Amino acid sequence: MRKTTSFYLKPLLVVMLAAGALSVQAAPIPDQATLQFRGSYGIPATMTFKRSGSQYTVSASINVPFYKIRFESGGTISGNQLNPSYYRDVRNGKVYASAQFSGSKATYGKAGETKTENVRGRVMDLFTLAWQLVFTDGQLPPNLMITNGKRLYPVRGISPAGTSQITFNGRKIDVNQFNVRRGDDTAQYGFAPALNGVPAIIRYNDGDKNYALTLKSVSINGQTVQP
């Protein structure tokens, strides 16, 4: 018998709304979820979500040969909302860029080059946003900004981008794709209904670097999830 998890009682169904937003059957927030990805050129990547009471952390590690990249963020949980308080881009064990959020203030920048701006809404990194979309029926928080630690980007909306397929444990599964417009660029997410709606594709650009992550395994609260 295949292992599954009680975290999701039913697969999350992703549909298109007339307004162009992502809609999923909202899921409870897990204590822990680990997603293994395959990156460009087969480079492995891992994204982990952890919850402890009203606190959460999200981490994503990309193991480029001779160059370890780790993105870290965390904050508080209120209902089904993630409220980030920090973000860090760590490269080879050293903080390359970071951001801190408090009230209407965001302080961000490369190490030693930070500045502070007023913001009207929450600020998230792209990995935290992936989970937020799952937990809130795909609704974007109002006045959302995206950060990579170096800059802040206004989010200009979310729109459906069709259905594709990925190979997961030797099987083809459907992935519903959506574009999130951030500044003058677009990040793409794909959510897999057969895998309880978790993020299955994450694609984005950061300067001259392109990141393309495709899901290859999922565990939630210690239990393996299969289609």
What are these regions (language model features)?
Residues 1, 102-105, 111:
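Short alpha-helix boundary/capping motifs
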Residues 2-13:
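Bacterial N-terminal signal peptides that target proteins for export
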Residues 22-26:
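Sec/Tat signal peptide C-region and signal peptidase I cleavage site
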Residues 27-103, 138-227:
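Acidic, serine/threonine-rich low-complexity disordered tracts
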Residues 107-130:
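Acidic/charged, solvent-exposed loop-and-adjacent secondary-structure segments enriched in E/D, K/R, S/T
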Residues 129-137:
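Beta-strand/loop-rich accessory regions of lumenal/periplasmic or secreted enzymes
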